[in-house]
């Protein structure tokens, strides 16, 4: 199997686990942003026409604190790195008052939301 496909599959499984954890432990609304992944060319064209943008984070957590309006979350496996368009989106999000975080585990999510809700970020 191709390395990129394996990475995407591992990130998929991690994001599914994160969603289950959020459902079990958190009381705020969140949603996935389906911009990435392999898909048929026509589907990709259709999504782009509907406003899909390269580099947008994997998830949005609709929770605010004293400083930030909400939280964009990029899911990466341990060795995963942000692409240039993801780094560009991070800067756009921060400039518009939204926190941006990269998570690699459920533990990262637990720490992130605890610190976020305590206004430590």
List the predicted regions and their residue ranges.
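Catalytic phosphate/metal-binding cores of nucleic-acid and nucleotide-processing enzymes, i.e., regions
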Residues: 1-121
